[in-house]
C-alpha cells in the first residue's frame, strides 16, 4: 500500500485542503466569538476530544486496511506533537502547551498546506484527516489569541526552537530502532520545499535555520500580541 503521497500544487485536493481550512476556521471562530463563556468552554473541550478522536480513528483505519506500521504510523512527527498540544490546551486547559503549539503548529501547518505530503497514504479518509489535523494545529493557537485572549511570551520563539532540538535525538534513535523517518531525520521529505536543500545530514541544518527564521518572522507578525514584559504566561 502507498504510504507517502504528495499532493500536487494546484490540484483538486490541494485546493480542497484550503477549502477545509477555510470552513473549519469559519465555524470555530464563529462559535468562539458568539457563544457565552460557559458554552465556549464546553465547545473547546469537545473540540479537543474531536481532534483526539480523529487521531484514534485514523490509527484504527490503518489497522483495518493493513497499512499500520512502526515505520510510518507512530505519532512522532512534529505536527503530531502539535496535535497533542492542542488537545492538552483545549480539553485539559494546559496553557503551557500554547507556546510550542503556536510556533510549531502555525509554521508546520502552513507548510503542510503549501507543500502537502501525506505520510499515511492517499485514501480519501486519510487525506481529509491530514487536512483536518493540520488545519487544527494552525487554528487552535490562532483561536487562543483572537478568541481566548492569550498573549505570546516575548521569548516564546526561542522556547519553541529549544524544544524542537530537545526532540531530535530521541526521535532519531527511535527511527534507527524501527526503521522510520519521523521528523524527516533520516531522509528528506518527498514533497519539494525550498527550505529542503542537500542530502543527509545537511538538509537538517536547513530545517534548523528555516525553523528559527519562521519563528522569528511569526513573532514579528504577532508583535502586538506579545505578553507585556512584567506579566507571566
Regions found by a protein language model. Give the residues of each.
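Aromatic-anchored segments of alpha-helical transmembrane domains
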Residues: 51-60, 105-116, 164-174
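Membrane-interface helix caps and helix-loop-helix hairpins in membrane proteins
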Residues: 63-72, 92-96, 116-128
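Hydrophobic cores of alpha-helical transmembrane segments in multi-pass inner/ER membrane proteins
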Residues: 17-29, 80-91, 133-147, 203-222
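Structural signature of hydrophobic alpha-helical transmembrane segments
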Residues: 14-21, 66-79, 99-102
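Membrane-interface helix-boundary motifs at transmembrane edges
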Residues: 33-44, 91-97, 147-158
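A glycine-rich, hydrophobic loop/mini-helix early in the fold
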Residues: 40-90
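Membrane-interface transmembrane-helix boundary segments in multi-pass integral membrane proteins
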Residues: 5-22, 159-162, 166, 176-215
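A contiguous pocket-lining binding segment that forms or flanks enzyme active sites
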Residues: 114-164
